[in-house]
């Protein structure tokens, strides 16, 4: 079933650039409106979000700018439109409507922007669902003022609308009639084929099945009938042919094929069925028309026939002739059964509507066919009689023409011929439109116009025989009158066929008729005497076949009305009659206008009532569906809440059980490690307490050794100081007198110092020996201590290793225990969720199978389910987190335990080494103490006089020297500073040098 709609595209001027510009604006506006909608929805959920309000305000301002730009462009384009042509008028209307829409939209956007500004100021999105109609009303007023300009083009617009409507209806009617005629031919072919095969009784079954198939799908009845006829002609039964055709048509539509593509598919499949073989050419033709169907057919044939796999592909198998038409038929049956073939798109529905109308016209066409055929046969007889009569007419007119040339009648005729042609053409145009409205005989008007030209040529050859001509015409009129019954039957049938469509042409016909009659009135008033004869002849018969006879009558009557007094008077009275008749015509058509207005108003009121009834009916249906849906949503919401609550309760019990179990395990492990830590800490404290007296013992030994060494050094120092004082005293007593004796004393002193050196060396060796003995003694002690510490740490390491092995074995047992539990829990939970998933899947499948529009509801439901499941897994995550924290706590306890152990070892070593250090410091302090005591026994100064430098004579140097009762030596120096030097500062510096031992 093919679509018969015809689309006419009128292009006015070069508007490509302008239309592309508007298209870009419309695209941008569409995107902005979508964004604004999302922002409004977001503000409903978060009414205090001022950022969203600012974004919406910016969006609306952008829309307002685009609307104003669009209005400006429309005004510019509107100013350049030429309203004198139908295309210009059509474009002017379109642009005016678009301009009004753009300005109304701009006013609405201004109101919305003010609302958003108020919301931003208040900080809350509380917009009332009201529209500011102030701007809209002004826009409507502007539209009213613009539409006042429609008066100047109203007539042209309505003419264009009427012409377009008549054209559309005419095209649709022609298409439906054409489809009905094609279907009639296909049915005749099917009927003849069935009769030839001896199955004429199956005609009703096959034809009705094909009509039903065409109405239910996007196929054409003609195509389905042809295909089923092909199958029947090849020997299939009526039932088999119907099944094959249904499978092919439904498969084509199921795989996206249209009614036009079905023609190519049917042609290719029919050729393969007729030839009895599957050719690559026909398969490619089928695939070209419906690629998806061709691919599916090939794959299905290969799947249903495993033996074809040896050829590798469908193409190879078809080239080898391994694929039969029977294989194709079975595969097509499978594809058709899977597809269903129901009407699925708007285009398919429209094709189905066209096919339904075509089939509705079929009974009328069948009834008209014998009547029209009979009339055509009779008209053929009339034409033969008229042809014989014309021979004598031509002969007579030739004689008449000669007489007219002689008396000057032709000169008068030539002057008025131009007016006659114009009038004749207008009247014939009216006749042509009327004939087209009732019978669709478009070609007759053109033939009539051509006949006028033929008449003008024939008049030059007209001659005599006016009486015979009139007699022949009367005979012809009598013949035509005798056939009045057949003509009435034809007219009644045609009116019954087209009654539903003539109304669309009445407006155009009235306008054209008024124009034509106005031209006719002008021609009559101009004195064209041919009109009376023309009307008289037209009252007899409108058919073009009488053109030559009419011309002859006109020629004879022209002479009568222009050359005789009687004719002139008759013509004057006829003109008066036409004037009164014209007034009646004008009144008649004026009344028709009011009549059509009343009919139209009644039709509009009736349509409004019907529409309101439909609206109320659909509103009731919608309300009923809403009530049913609310009940369904309430039921499933309650059901889901119950299920979720049960799951939450069960899961809370599971998590509570495992949380308590895990806390118990953590407490046990923590207690074990606390016990181990306490044990090791006690051992360490015992070790430190045990070795503390030993350290004190070492310290006392070192203190004793230090004291001995310090005492020895103090004795040596005392001897040296005593000897030194003796030498100084002797030197002071005899220095002035016994210079020679000094060398002897020097040798004595040298000997003494040698002895002292020997003594000091011997003393040092003794000290070294003592020290070595002490070091050996303490080395043995430290080696013993090191062995004890090493043994202690080895024991601690063994103990910790054993303890760790025990802990590991305990943990392995615990982890194995919990692994089994968790595996069991995982299986249980997996089973529960699998059951829930199966339940949800089945419930969802059933619900979507019944209600395809509940996506929003179940979206919310499953969002809730998602949150619940998320909460469940969050609880599971908390449980796992607690377990992990407990495990890490245990291991942190282990780390702290070993940290304490090694910290204790470090502290032990620090204590031991610290004891050694303190011992050495104590020994040093003891020696220093003994040395200070020995030094206190031998007071005095080690400063000696410089005998070889006499400073007394110059007033510098040592001035006095004395020894006090406590054996202290006091030396008095006379110090003078150089130029610019402070003596006090110089004395302080010298004293500081003495105190530091550097002088």
Curated annotation (Swiss-Prot):
It holds the Pfam family TMP_3. One of its GO terms (biological process) is viral tail assembly. GO terms for cellular component: virion component. Keywords: Viral release from host cell, Viral tail assembly, Virion. Gene3D superfamilies: Apolipoprotein. Its main location: virion. It is found in: Virion. InterPro entries: Tape_meas_N. The keyword Nuclease does not apply. Disulfide bonds: none annotated. Probable tape measure protein. Serves as a base for tail tube protein polymerization and acts as a template for tail length determination. PANTHER family: FELS-2 PROPHAGE PROTEIN. Belongs to the skunalikevirus tape measure protein family. This is Probable tape measure protein. The lineage of its organism: Viruses, Duplodnaviria, Heunggongvirae, Uroviricota, Caudoviricetes.
